[in-house]
């Protein structure tokens, strides 16, 4: 492979990943924007803080994507397709365990998050609503890491980017469609 075609291949693989990484904070930004258009600033404050908490929390599991990429790429290079399936299933099982632990530990995560910020009672109520919504989305959020790692490891970065984009749009749509009913509780 020539140096020029090698560089072209790198760009071909990396550009979709670059754009997918731009989409990842999209959900928190849009949720914050939706809350900012409501008549009460407490919505905006609560969503912004909770979005930051979950950016840090879910970001700490980025190893799921990078670890999946490395293992899948090795198995793909060896043409060991059974191992690719096994790696994917093991990582999904790990995601299930992590998600269940996050749900079990949600009270501690919630209380720790609130101990960092001084919030009014009203803001705490809205923080609780968004926090609960996001903690139960843990499985989906972390599964996306494994799925994108799978496709990046198989050098199908466009597919990986499309999945991230679709998931982000679906999450934003869900928030937009359910926002009025969730705030009236």
Task: Give residue ranges: language-model regions.
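Transmembrane alpha-helical core residues of multi-pass small-molecule transporters
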Residues: 166-170
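Short alpha-helical transmembrane segments in multi-pass integral membrane proteins
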Residues: 1-14, 72-139, 173, 177-183
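Alpha-helical transmembrane segments of multipass membrane proteins
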Residues: 29, 146-150, 173
């Amino acid at each position: 492979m020539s140096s020029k075609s090698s560089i072209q291949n790198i760009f071909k693989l990396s550009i979709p990943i670059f754009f997918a990484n731009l989409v990842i904070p999209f959900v928190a930004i849009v949720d914050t924007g939706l809350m900012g258009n409501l008549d009460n600033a407490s919505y905006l404050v609560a969503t912004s803080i909770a979005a930051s908490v979950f950016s840090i929390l879910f970001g700490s599991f980025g190893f799921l994507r990078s670890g999946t990429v490395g293992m899948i790429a090795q198995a793909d290079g060896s043409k060991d397709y059974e191992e690719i399936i096994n790696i994917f299933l093991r990582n999904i099982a790990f995601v299930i365990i992590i998600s269940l632990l996050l749900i079990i530990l949600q009270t501690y995560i919630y209380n720790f998050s609130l101990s960092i910020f001084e919030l009014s009672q009203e803001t705490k109520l809205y923080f609780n609503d968004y926090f609960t919504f996001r903690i139960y989305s843990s499985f989906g959020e972390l599964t996306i890491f494994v799925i994108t790692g799978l496709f990046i490891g198989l050098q199908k970065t466009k597919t990986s980017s499309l999945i991230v984009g679709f998931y982000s749009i679906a999450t934003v749509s869900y928030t937009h469609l359910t926002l009025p009913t969730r705030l009236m509780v």
